[in-house]
């Protein structure tokens, strides 16, 4: 096991220079440096993720509103939201986060581009949290799953015009007037496609379309699409 001194200050600088130049570097030292470098990066990502999480819990209007709505549903307006239910961790899959009814919210520290991406992701998962408490969602029921995905993508801000434009620009198929709805539908289909009870992307699209009108129109706990 490496001492913490090997991974800090001058000693880390020395090891980095040795790794980059290869001078006097044994295969074992090379492997150890790469392992230590990865561990340092993971720790840095984790600390940054929690820093952003805490900032959003304190200052983001959307996140704060959702936390208040969840708290009222959960134990009453006087109870405190348990932020330990929102954890940061490394994710091998290409996703920004996830929600589990028993475990809470996962923020994928290695997939989040910046503070504002984390805000969208956290808002998305908090909407799933709200839905699960309010309607006791059966996440293996495709219609339940699709409805919550539609709401989460629509209300979280991840499909607002500017975010969708940054992703797609003026590519074929991008329509300014219905960009928000196209984004919500696309992301909902992708999420439902990953459900173990979903047979194919076409199956997911069919389910999303079946529940679209009622679920897209349901903006609770907001009065309207806020972001």
Swiss-Prot record:
It comes from the Eukaryota. Changing residue 125 to Q: Abolishes proteolytic processing of ATP6, but still promotes assembly of the ATP6 precursor into the ATPase CF(0) particle. Changing residue 124 to A: Abolishes proteolytic processing of ATP6, but still promotes assembly of the ATP6 precursor into the ATPase CF(0) particle. Keywords: Hydrolase, Membrane, Metal-binding, Metalloprotease, Mitochondrion, Mitochondrion inner membrane, Protease. The keyword Nucleotide-binding does not apply. Changing residue 128 to A: Abolishes proteolytic processing of ATP6, but still promotes assembly of the ATP6 precursor into the ATPase CF(0) particle. GO terms for cellular component: mitochondrial inner membrane; mitochondrial intermembrane space. PROSITE patterns: ZINC_PROTEASE. Its EC number is 3.4.24.-. It is found in: Mitochondrion inner membrane. The active site is at residue 125. InterPro entries: Peptidase_M76_ATP23. One of its GO terms (molecular function) is metal ion binding. GO terms for biological process: mitochondrial protein processing; mitochondrial proton-transporting ATP synthase complex assembly. A divalent metal cation binds at residues 124, 128. It is a peripheral membrane protein. Belongs to the peptidase M76 family. Has a dual role in the assembly of mitochondrial ATPase. Acts as a protease that removes the N-terminal 10 residues of mitochondrial ATPase CF(0) subunit 6 (ATP6) at the intermembrane space side. Also involved in the correct assembly of the membrane-embedded ATPase CF(0) particle, probably mediating association of ATP6 with the subunit 9 ring. Interacts with ATP6. This is Mitochondrial inner membrane protease ATP23. It comes from Saccharomyces cerevisiae (strain ATCC 204508 / S288c).
